[in-house]
Amino acid sequence: MSEELAQGPKESPPAPRAGPREVWKKGGRLLSVLLAVNVLLLACTLISGGAFNKVAVYDTDVFALLTAMMLLATLWILFYLLRTVRCPCAVPYRDAHAGPIWLRGGLVLFGICTLIMDVFKTGYYSSFFECQSAIKILHPLIQAVFVIIQTYFLWVSAKDCVHVHLDLTWCGLMFTLTTNLAIWMAAVVDESVHQSHSYSSSHSNASHARLISDQHADNPVGGDSCLCSTAVCQIFQQGYFYLYPFNIEYSLFASTMLYVMWKNVGRFLASTPGHSHTPTPVSLFRETFFAGPVLGLLLFVVGLAVFIIYEVQVSGDGSRTRQALVIYYSFNIVCLGLTTLVSLSGSIIYRFDRRAMDHHKNPTRTLDVALLMGAALGQYAISYYSIVAVVAGTPQDLLAGLNLTHALLMIAQHTFQNMFIIESLHRGPPGAEPHSTHPKEPCQDLTFTNLDALHTLSACPPNPGLVSPSPSDQREAVAIVSTPRSQWRRQCLKDISLFLLLCNVILWIMPAFGARPHFSNTVEVDFYGYSLWAVIVNICLPFGIFYRMHAVSSLLEVYVLS
């Protein structure tokens, strides 16, 4: 000890040579986050203020802000496409996990529906141009241009890991993300106000009050000339309200892809970052029992019929409304119960699955898990409020029992489905066996599941029962070493994924296109009061709707990776 003190402190050994160093990201990211927070709070203030008649903020102010934001975001996207990516070594890496084909395909589909909605909006506001501000006609036109440019940008650049113009790219991506969130909030608020006025009209024998109130707010002296009285105007009005769900999903899909791009700015990737999202075209639609797709399609068709019956009967007299609610709750209880059991069975199958876990850094998967867990909170909140209202405040009749069962199954279904999806996303691809800590194990205890494993026989001790396969009989060897149990598990997981996917699609369609049993069933309205219950539903339900569509995207990925 004394000799060491006399010699003085030893020099630390030189650090090993590392790869290219990443630039310090905290400054640019912090600036972009602060920019997004401030812009989002401003947009949220105007949008929420414009939803109330007593607040002196008009919808024209909201349209003006959204139009300005879309113009600025479009200018930055054009700068990125025409200048940033054309710099030398601007995109040295591309993230294979980001922007899978089904996510970009869904973005294009929802973008097309958003363009149709913009056409309907333009036609609707042009029907009484003399009573409207010019910004109401300019806004859908600018939005159409923004959707076209942004969709192309995300299609070609979703996988980019940019290494030039870092601060500008961080701020531009975050501002574009904020623009999409502001558009989403405006659409959600507009649809919620429309639903609230529809409920008020059905309970007060008044006419459709929302359009009239908006028109008189814009031009109090306009008189009857501002009424949407023509058949074409009515078609435009109903059309763009029914297309709002697609606009909402487009904004959320774009926001998730922009966030992954923001995380990938300045990122260095290893040469083998784990499994890819790209499936083989041969195995994409094979190796299923077809029980899951058939049962899922059956529930989908029945769900559409139930939804149509509900929409037709719920606005009738008391007995027809009660009958519609019983049919609606009964179908949802069956669907939620089956999806809960199927999700639980999928998690049980994973207990016998020997595929290795994928621990590589993956911003896309991290975001998927966070969105699944966060979006489920909205439906959790509605369900717990319903449970309290049913247990504490109503007589126990058939409708109350169905409502309580529906709320409990909704909680269970979200919980077990999230467990199944999250565990599936963290599994490696088929054939990825977990690495053993003892590399030299007896060969008789191994089961090989791919061709590469056959070439590792030389590292094992000689065994008379195993022979080195020749190229001519490799196909026969694969048939010998492939275990039927693993094949059976893969088929079950594919069927489970397809069944859950189809069920989540119909469970998305019902609330997204106007099914509101929360207000038709007066249990919660009587217990909490309409004002409080409307706030709870209008805040939480959009997250529940988004959960369904995001679960569809994740389940499609689970199906491909199974």
UniProtKB/Swiss-Prot annotation:
Its main location: membrane. GO terms for cellular component: membrane; plasma membrane. InterPro entries: Otopetrin. Actives at neutral and alkaline extracellular pH, acid extracellular pH appears to inhibit the channel. Insensitive to activation by Zn(2+). Keywords: Cell membrane, Hydrogen ion transport, Ion channel, Ion transport, Membrane, Transmembrane, Transmembrane helix, Transport. It is found in: Cell membrane. One of its GO terms (molecular function) is proton channel activity. The keyword Ion transport applies. One of its GO terms (biological process) is proton transmembrane transport. Proton-selective ion channel open at neutral pH. Actives at neutral and alkaline extracellular pH, likely participates in some alkali-related physiological activities. This is Proton channel OTOP2. It comes from Homo sapiens (Human). The lineage of its organism: Eukaryota, Metazoa, Chordata, Craniata, Vertebrata. The gene is OTOP2.
